[in-house]
């Protein structure tokens, strides 16, 4: 059982608007559902396909708004981030983990990260964005070993 943690404080009576990228992915679904445990947040669940089974499941939750957005499409992110207070951003090395071999992994995730960061900056400059959370990886490599880290680890580090 999870202990409910208040991650954002607000003196305003209106709900904080929290955008969650890749909302239908494993991590995104968990974030959306956890935030939805209280009535304090309006959650903007950003996904490539708002008609997918997972998206429709999220859309049935209170306080959840489905928004079409793709980390590979900066304009869709710009629209999705308008008027948000908080952005939870995560990236993926592949589209559905099917292309998990070779350099495409790194370049795909780096492009997502570049688009995400640029649109977060735009949202901050033009709106009311106060918090940005980027889901990354830490300590995934043993510093005592000389093994190279996998590309999908180093790409997250470089996005940071």
Regions found by a protein language model. Name each.
Residues 7, 138-151:
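Active-site "gating" loop of Rossmann-like NAD(P)-dependent oxidoreductase/epimerase domains
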Residues 17, 85-86, 131:
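Structural motif
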Residues 21, 46, 90, 134-137:
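SDR active-site strand-loop-helix element
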């Amino acid at each position: 059982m999870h202990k409910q943690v208040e991650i954002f404080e607000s003196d305003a009576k209106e709900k904080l608007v929290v955008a969650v990228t890749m909302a239908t992915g494993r991590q995104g679904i968990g974030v959306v559902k956890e935030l939805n445990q209280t009535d304090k947040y309006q959650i903007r669940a950003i996904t490539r396909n708002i008609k997918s089974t997972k998206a429709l499941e999220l859309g049935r939750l209170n306080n959840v708004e489905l928004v079409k957005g793709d980390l590979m499409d900066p304009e869709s992110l710009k629209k999705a981030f308008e008027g948000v207070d908080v952005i939870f951003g995560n990236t993926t090395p592949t589209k559905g983990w099917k292309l998990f071999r070779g350099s495409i992994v790194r370049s795909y995730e780096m492009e997502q990260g570049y688009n995400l960061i640029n649109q977060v900056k735009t949202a901050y400059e033009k709106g009311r964005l106060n918090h940005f959370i980027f889901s990354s990886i830490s300590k995934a490599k043993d510093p005592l070993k000389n093994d190279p880290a996998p590309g999908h680890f180093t790409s997250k580090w470089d996005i940071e």
